[in-house]
Amino acid sequence: MIRVIKTIDAHVGGQPLRLVVDGMPRPHGKSSAQQREWCLKHADAYRRALVNPPRGHADITAALITDPSTLQANAGLVFLDAGGYPSMSGHAVIAVTTIAFERRLALAHPPGNGEERLVFDTPAGSVHARARLELHGGARSVDSVAVTNVPAFVHAPAVPVLVGRRDLRVDIAFGGAFYAIVDSEATGVPLDAAHVPELRRLGADISASVNLTHRPVHPADSSIAGVAGVIFTGPAVDPEAHLRNVTVRASGSVDRSPGGTGTSAVMAVLDAMGLLPDHQAFVHESLSGALFRGRPLHRTIVADYPALVTEIEGSAWITGEHTFFLDDDDPFREGGSF
């Protein structure tokens, strides 16, 4: 038997997103978190096939459109990557929104000029996407997408982490996923392409250490636990940006975009330190040179944690449409990685 899966691929700042549009079973569950759990138990072979070689790679994120679980939402989203099922992905929401309007998917009403909005339920909570559309050569395209994210907060500041001979301090913060945020100057590793292998190794070691000794758990949802990766921050290269970052996921993959959930987490840390002015854009730069614009919207409380609701804006470009075959006779139909 040969199963067929169709996807539309895009990128945000060079970071790929693969949106499944046909061929995967519809996940069951009354919430996005339950739908994610259903995928893990009943459809994980599809995730492995789409994100592992030969069809995918360690750095790719995929998304599956699901039924909404709240009245306000247009759809739900379940995210898939080499490490499993992330609770939230900002760059994925930007890409999915762009695909929805430019390819006129059923969840998006016919686009006009100006702004259009979509609401997605995710395992981390509901997020609002605001697409800015423009007319280019007679066709409407999405110029940018601003995502109002779930509340971000600092879970634990200045956590001591011993990695090899390095005695580091990291801030553990949540922005849709948990991250360990560290000043690159303290590590002695520059934030440039030549040092990506070293950043990759160090990031994986820090993630492992934090998850072993200071594993964070979301106070409102215990299914969201552990750091998803490490964010190395340092001086920006682009004069428009305030900070540069390199995000290394716990699996060791490197984000080419500034990271949507990561940008929210960094903003929460800056806000807690009194370094984030109200109602001013925070421009975050990635190693690829891509920029995200973050805006603080309002403060709130998550359990006992002071939290910040942020809006993260970036742009996506569609790169292709794919038809994948999963042949039951193929011993590598689910792919794999070393």
Q: What does each of the following model-derived ranges do?
A:
Residues 1-171, 180-338:
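A glycine-rich beta-to-alpha transition motif near the start of alpha/beta enzyme domains, typified by
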Residues 176:
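Glycine-rich ThDP/TPP pyrophosphate-binding loop and its adjacent helix/strand module
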